[in-house]
Regions:
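Conserved class I S-adenosyl-L-methionine
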Residues: 1-38, 40-49, 133-158
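Conserved Class I S-adenosyl-L-methionine
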Residues: 175-248
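A short, conserved alpha-helix within the catalytic core of class I
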Residues: 112-123
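A conserved beta-strand element that flanks and buttresses the S-adenosyl-L-methionine
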Residues: 104
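Short alpha-helix
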Residues: 156-171
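Class I SAM-dependent methyltransferase SAM/SAH-binding core
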Residues: 49-93
């Protein structure tokens, strides 16, 4: 298991960032939502990490609040964005001082026990202003990455079930839209592909680590292309929640 403060984690994460369009695609998709908001007073980034996503949108809002319980990551965020209001608490105990026009939780639910997902989603929505939107981003359950997790550990991250439970509980109070947006990791060789796979497999706490050979064989069988590259689908689900009734998938 990687330590998020360790060099191995940083190196693997950087290789992932250098070889994927996932973050760029997410910023593009989110920007379209931000552009259509009726007000841009407050932005809450829940699970803000080191502030990379926060930075992309903070300038569009009069006030930005970042929630990040990892003090190492929070320090990086505060250095990069000194004007942001930082809350060093988990989502369930944080109490933001204002309702937000955008509540964003991007790729954070992996690190939350799944039996707490519904409570976290409810908490995020409670911070939303009457005309605002809550957005949760997570990898789609059918991506190449999730297939790999399932192959080695029998597990997938599936946000849709939590959304269905939320809708069942809230009935017609909220308008919910689920959109899947394509993204890919594209590496030039097996060494970098393995580093990315190792990073992705560490989304789960591993009791029994698969061997390097087993992971490399899986990469060869599932992600190697004819030109010798490795392409791993990492499509993202975007859940939009607003006040209102009806829901749809796209």
């Amino acid at each position: 298991m990687f330590d998020s403060q360790g060099e191995a984690y940083k190196e693997a994460f950087q290789i992932f960032l250098d070889h994927t369009d996932q973050k760029r695609n997410a910023r593009r998709w989110l920007q379209q939502v931000v552009d259509t908001l009726p007000a841009k007073r407050v932005f809450i980034d829940a699970g803000a990490g080191n502030g990379e996503v926060t930075k992309a949108f903070a300038g569009a809002f009069a006030r930005t609040i970042a929630i990040e319980p990892n003090l190492y990551l929070l320090k990086q965020l505060q250095q990069a964005l000194p004007s942001v209001e930082a809350i060093a608490l988990p989502i369930l105990t944080a109490q933001p001082p204002a309702q937000a026009d955008l509540v964003l939780c991007s790729h954070t639910f992996y690190y939350i026990p799944q039996d707490q997902w519904l409570a976290h989603l409810q908490r995020l929505v409670s911070w939303m202003s009457p005309t605002g939107v809550t957005i949760v981003v997570l990898q789609n359950r059918e991506t190449g990455c999730m297939n790999m997790l399932h192959h080695f550990f029998g597990h997938r991250f599936d946000l849709r079930r939590t959304v269905e439970a939320f809708q069942s509980q809230q009935r017609d109070r909220y308008h919910v839209v689920l959109t899947t947006d394509p993204a890919t990791v594209d590496t030039p060789d097996r060494v970098k592909a393995y580093a990315v796979a190792e990073f992705m497999l560490n989304l789960l706490e591993m009791k029994h680590t698969p061997s390097r050979r087993a992971v490399e064989e899986y990469l060869e069988a599932n992600f190697r292309t004819q030109d010798g590259r490795y392409r791993i689908p990492v499509h993202q689900d975007f859940i939009e929640i607003r006040q209102g009734a009806t829901s749809r998938h796209s």
